[in-house]
């Protein structure tokens, strides 16, 4: 910017020539500050200099202001020749003698004045310690932490002493934070002693009380300890360029690793950030972009076991301009507009100065947000204007010059202006033409505004030059208005006419008062009301009319009260009855509109211990929100358990009850409609009964968009996004609509569980950001969220609802029922049950196992299994070792605690070979480490006894069978039925067996496969000497038995081909209970008859089988498992190496039952069998499954 001494002559010559026809325009050499005062902190009796140097056209006068008032200079305080303020000795006494305060310098020349930024002068102080270090007891190897806090200006430097000597900080395990925290990691015995902190400032030094550190010897056993953050980060608010420390101290075994991240997933600034000690985050030269939520995470190495702590860093920034006002040149009666935009944290407040003095809005000068508009410019408006933005962090100013151009040919002002009231909303305004240059007038401008109050808006109406009167008919009743007239010509406008004030007439009230109803006893109602706002009163209220009646009675009683009253007590009413009340107000003109009926129930006559009605007060906050406040009567002795709040729009259904605590005295009702009347009732209750209720009505004001119908409501926020952060918090993010460039936008977030019944649980949160972390939610619960915005007194509709569910809680307990079973020489099976608790969600299990030697070294082997599995294999175990096993459950939130350690002894090979398998060493959930898993003497004795009993039973059965077979050799052959023992192997039901007994007379109950069978025309010799088969045609020659591999046949197909007859032949293989051969024939079989074979099912011997541990499942009592047992089941074929020796007569119906009961899943698993079959006999092979 050029200085006045360099450009004065040139500017005067050029502008003098250019503006020769326009007298009144001068050269303006800009006035500005070279140096401005800064914030200063000084000690008492110190000398202080506050700089202030201005440049511009001389002469420049500099004066100083303190807290807005002029500084009185004396020998101690005076202005230097360069404009700076000098204070020889700073005084710090309380009251007027103190020099502390905000200082500004004002520079003035003939074109105007400018004001500097504020300078805050403070005295250096230090207070007593707010937090003293406390004695503590720490185990050797643990973490010790001391803290102290003291308020000082400037901030004190904190150091530490141990046993009254300076604590050396050269060791890596000792960290002293600038915030006054001392951390000692890996505590040793030599660290024991007395600690204290020392706070030092430029003026003084203070020492805290001493705290003792006692060190306890560490135990040899160091059990696993889940990570815990014992000192997490705290919310911090810092100014720009300061240094911030976020503390994080964690314990655990093994030692946890501490890491830092941001909740918004932005990267942490590595250039200004470093880690102090073992995990404290230090951010130097803080900037606005550093603000956010920082997350400290402590993790056990090699596991997913972690815990987190969060803190919010808020960075405050002084104001800075993003738009500056520009100098303007305007003619008289023109309009000047200055724009100014500033940003900062918190949002700065904008104000305007004219020649260093604050401007207030009036009729001509208006301030819209951050804009300054000057209408009907007059010569006095020629000045320097400054935009000042200020917040708690400081102030900044920007300047602009308004130059008013004058014209000599302008007309004189209209005169003899007078006004006459026409009605409650109209005034007639008349005037006379200007005395000078009236023939050049082309139009008149009528200006009017309310005479009372501040910041009233001025209205303007332009009319032609052919009239000298005008009726303004949009005025408010019973109000004073001020008017003036301006005449216009092509080259400019006249001066303003004289001002005239006139009063409009009264009118009937536009609205009824808001009433409140309470009861002091069961037989009365106290009616109270608030005065009608002047906007709706339209005059002075002289009368009130109260109307009331029973809700069941149509008779209305009316009372008239003077306009000065504000309450009335109705007495002699019925207890426990609903009364309807309404009120009307009147001015001298007449009665206004009555309110709607308001209901109130009188208390019960027996309500002697019921709480009295609270004193209720309603206040609208904005067009959609009201605040409900109440106060309980101090003389009320009844117990109060809580409050019930109800509200409704007139003519609509009531909402509530909203249940509130007894300590609550305020509640905010949101989501209402503008310009609506609402009825609110509140009552206290206890465990005996409900108390007396208080009723009151309130009207919500109109929103700008509703009142004018010209500005539509803003659109709601878009792209609302929700993401579960923890089990108790959900992160919300949404987009800002592109409809406006407004800097200040506030948002309301509505949050409630899905299907909520109690309206008091609806949560409304406020923020100015486009994101929020909603905390304090219930785990594993679905919530619905909606957002609306507020800008310039406008509120948008609610955004579309978004649903999201919080994460489940991390498992609180370990898996239960942990068992370990040795199933191979080097393989063990571990099984468990999920943690207790129906709400526990498990997505993964972590199995840690190690031998004793590895455990001592801290080396664990890790296995992971999905949450649906409750078994796993431990492979490659070394014989002769004892293994320790423990299990933990985890989900996406975190990992739960580990179970108690379970031991498994893997015996040496020579020991395991001497004991025949299977031997399973089952291990239960145990806290003792010495429980070895082997078969004791009692178990071996039980096994031997059981085997002996089984062998004895088998021997007895064989003897009985031999005895019965000999007894039947002499008897005539009879058809017999298979024994119930045989039927048990072929899955023949008892019901089917009973039917056979009824149809066949004389069937032996326990016939075995060694007995001969005769039926009709066939006889089979089963004595063992021959395999000859004789039928009605004679002996049947049996060819050599051939092995054939057969597949299962369809059961349905077999049934359709099976002849319907009563008896069939059945030839059994040598192995009872394994394969049944049934010969079916209505007539003797011919040699060429084709055989039909069907092999339903067969089970192999029970063998040990173990699938991959990745697919393990709990099988219940046996402990064996198989994830794919259906696919891997191996069935062995049953073959006969000897000729068929026996035959049975079996009922045809029984054979069908055999088929139905034994053929299962044959379509899914066709199995191949080798059978010995005679070439000429049609046989069907039935395999029975033993359960």
Curated annotation (Swiss-Prot):
Main subcellular localisation: membrane
Subcellular location: Membrane
Disulfide-linked positions: 52-105, 148-197, 248-296, 340-387
Matching PROSITE patterns: FN3 (PS50853), IG_LIKE (PS50835)
Gene from which the chain derives: PRTG
Positions of the UniProt region annotated as Disordered: 1103-1134, 1154-1187
The name this protein goes by in its record: Protogenin
Coiled coil residues, start to end: none
Similarity remark: Belongs to the immunoglobulin superfamily. DCC family.
Ranges of Basic and acidic residues composition bias in the record: 1103-1130
CDD domains associated with the record: FN3 (cd00063)
Organism domain of life: Eukaryota
Tissue expression from the record: In the embryo, expressed in early mesodermal cells, the neuroepithelial layer of the brain and the trunk neural tube, the neural layer of the retina and in the epithelial somite and dermomyotome. From mid-gastrulation to early somite stages, restricted to the posterior embryonic region but this posterior restriction is progressively lost during somitogenesis. As development proceeds, further restricted to the dorsal parts of the spinal cord and somites. In parallel, expression progresses caudally during axis elongation.
């Amino acid at each position: 910017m050029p200085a006045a001494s360099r450009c004065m002559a040139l500017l005067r010559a050029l502008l003098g020539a250019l503006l020769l026809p326009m007298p009144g325009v001068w050269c303006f050499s800009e006035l500005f500050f070279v140096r401005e005062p800064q914030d200063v902190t000084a000690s008492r009796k110190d000398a202080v200099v506050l700089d202030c140097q201005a440049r511009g056209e001389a002469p420049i006068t500099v004066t100083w202001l303190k807290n807005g008032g002029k500084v009185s200079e004396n020998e101690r305080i005076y202005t230097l020749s360069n404009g700076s303020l000098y204070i020889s000795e700073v005084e710090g006494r309380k009251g007027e003698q103190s020099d502390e305060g905000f200082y500004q310098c004002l520079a003035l020349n003939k074109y105007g004045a400018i004001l500097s930024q504020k300078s805050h002068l403070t005295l250096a102080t230090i207070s007593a310690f707010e937090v003293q270090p406390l004695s503590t007891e720490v185990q050797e190897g643990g973490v010790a932490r001391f803290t102290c806090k003291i308020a000082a200006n400037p901030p004190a430097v904190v150091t530490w002493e141990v046993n009254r000597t300076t604590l050396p900080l050269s060791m890596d395990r000792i960290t002293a934070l600038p915030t006054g925290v001392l951390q000692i990691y890996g505590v040793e015995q030599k660290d024991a002693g007395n600690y204290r902190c020392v706070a030092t400032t430029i003026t003084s030094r203070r020492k805290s009380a001493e705290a003792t550190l006692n060190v306890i010897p560490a135990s040899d056993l160091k059990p696993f300890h889940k990570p815990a953050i014992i000192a997490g980060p705290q919310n911090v608010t810092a100014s720009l360029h300061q240094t911030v420390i976020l503390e994080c101290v964690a314990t655990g075994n093994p030692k946890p690793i501490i890491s830092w991240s941001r909740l918004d997933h932005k990267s942490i600034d590595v250039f200004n950030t470093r880690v102090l000690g073992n995990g404290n985050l230090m951010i130097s030269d803080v900037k606005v972009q550093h603000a956010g939520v920082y997350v400290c995470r402590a993790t056990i190495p090699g596991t997913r076991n972690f815990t987190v702590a969060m803190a919010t860093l808020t960075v405050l920034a002084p104001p800075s301009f993003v738009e500056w006002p520009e100098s303007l040149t305007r003619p008289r009666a023109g309009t000047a507009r200055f724009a100014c935009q500033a940003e900062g944290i918190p949002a700065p407040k904008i104000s305007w100065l004219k020649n260093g003095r604050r401007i207030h809005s009036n009729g001509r000068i208006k301030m819209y947000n951050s804009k300054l508009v000057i209408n009907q410019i007059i010569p006095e408006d020629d000045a320097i204007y400054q935009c000042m933005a200020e917040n708690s962090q400081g102030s900044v100013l920007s300047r602009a010059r308004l130059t008013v151009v004058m014209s000599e040919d302008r007309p004189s002002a209209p005169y003899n202006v007078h006004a006459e009231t026409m009605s409650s909303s109209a005034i007639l305004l008349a005037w006379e033409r200007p005395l000078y240059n009236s023939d050049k007038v082309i139009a008149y401008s009528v200006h009017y505004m309310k005479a009372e109050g501040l910041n009233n808006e001025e209205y303007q109406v332009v009319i032609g030059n052919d009239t000298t009167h005008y009726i303004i008919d949009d005025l408010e009743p019973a109000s004073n208005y001020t008017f003036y007239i301006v005449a216009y010509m092509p080259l400019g406008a006249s001066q303003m006419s004289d001002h005239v004030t006139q009063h409009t007439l009264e009118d009937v009230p536009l609205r009824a008062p808001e009433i409140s109803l309470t009861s002091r006893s069961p037989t009365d109602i106290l009616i109270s009301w608030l005065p009608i706002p002047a906007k709706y009163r339209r005059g002075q209220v002289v009368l009130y009319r109260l109307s009331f009646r029973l809700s069941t009675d149509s008779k209305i009683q009316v009372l008239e009260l003077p306009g000065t009253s504000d309450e009335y007590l109705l007495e002699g009413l019925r207890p426990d009855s609903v009364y309807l009340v309404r009120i009307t107000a009147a001015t001298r003109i007449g009665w206004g509109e009555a309110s709607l009926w308001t209901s109130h129930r009188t208390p019960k006559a027996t309500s002697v211990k019921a709480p009295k009605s609270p004193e209720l007060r309603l206040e609208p906050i904005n067009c959609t929100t009201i605040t409900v406040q109440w106060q309980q009567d101090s003389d009320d002795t009844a117990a109060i358990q809580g409050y019930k709040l109800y509200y409704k729009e007139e003519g609509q259904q009531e909402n509530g009850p909203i249940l509130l605590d007894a300590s609550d005295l305020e509640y905010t009702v949101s989501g209402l409609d503008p310009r609506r009347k609402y009825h609110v009732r509140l009552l206290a209750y206890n465990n005996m009964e409900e108390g007396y209720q208080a009723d009151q009505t309130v009207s919500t004001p109109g929103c700008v968009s509703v009142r004018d119908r010209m500005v539509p409501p803003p659109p709601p926020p878009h792209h609302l996004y929700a993401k579960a952060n923890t089990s108790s918090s959900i992160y919300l993010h949404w987009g800002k609509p592109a409809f406006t460039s407004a800097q200040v936008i506030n948002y309301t977030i509505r949050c409630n569980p899905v299907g909520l019944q109690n309206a008091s649980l609806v949560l409304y949160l406020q923020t100015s950001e486009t994101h929020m972390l909603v905390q304090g939610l219930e785990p594993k619960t679905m919530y619905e969220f909606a957002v609306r915005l507020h800008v310039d007194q406008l509120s948008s509709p609610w955004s579309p609802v978004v649903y999201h569910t919080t994460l489940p809680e991390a498992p609180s307990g370990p898996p239960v029922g942990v068992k370990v079973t040795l199933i191979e020489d080097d393989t063990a099976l571990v099984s468990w049950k999920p943690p207790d608790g129906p709400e526990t969600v498990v997505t993964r299990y972590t199995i840690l196992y190690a031998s004793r030697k590895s455990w001592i070294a801290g080396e664990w082997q890790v296995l992971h299994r999905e949450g649906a599995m409750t078994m796993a294999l431990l492979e490659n175990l070394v014989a002769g070792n004892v293994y320790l096993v423990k299990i933990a459950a985890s989900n996406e939130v975190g990992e739960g605690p580990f179970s108690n350690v379970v031991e498994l002894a893997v015996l040496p090979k020579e020991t395991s070979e001497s004991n025949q398998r299977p031997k399973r060493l089952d291990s239960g959930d145990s806290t003792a480490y010495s429980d070895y898993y082997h078969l004791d003497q009692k178990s071996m004795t039980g096994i031997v006894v059981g085997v002996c009993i089984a062998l004895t039973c088998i021997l007895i059965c064989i003897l009985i069978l031999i005895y019965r077979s000999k007894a039947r050799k002499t008897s005539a052959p009879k058809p017999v039925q298979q024994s119930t023992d045989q039927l048990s192997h072929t899955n023949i039901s008892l019901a089917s067996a009973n039917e056979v007994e009824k149809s066949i007379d004389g069937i032996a109950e326990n016939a075995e496969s060694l007995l001969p069978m005769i039926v009709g025309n066939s006889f089979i010799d089963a004595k063992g000497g021959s395999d000859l088969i004789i039928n009605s045609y004679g002996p049947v020659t049996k060819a050599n038995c051939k092995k054939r591999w057969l597949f299962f046949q369809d059961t349905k197909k077999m049934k359709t081909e099976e002849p319907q007859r009563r008896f069939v032949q059945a030839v059994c293989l040598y192995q009872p209970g394994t394969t049944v051969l049934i010969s079916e024939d209505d007539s003797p079989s011919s040699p060429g008859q084709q055989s039909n074979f069907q092999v339903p099912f067969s089970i192999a011997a029970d063998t040990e089988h173990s699938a991959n541990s990745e697919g393990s499942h709990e099988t219940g009592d046996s402990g064996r498992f198989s994830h794919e047992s259906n696919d891997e089941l191996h069935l062995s074929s049953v073959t006969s190496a000897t000729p068929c020796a026996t035959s049975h007569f079996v009922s045809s119906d029984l054979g069908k039952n055999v088929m139905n009961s034994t053929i299962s899943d044959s379509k899914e698993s066709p199995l191949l069998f080798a059978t010995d079959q005679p070439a000429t006999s049609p046989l069907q092979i039935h395999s029975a499954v033993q359960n």
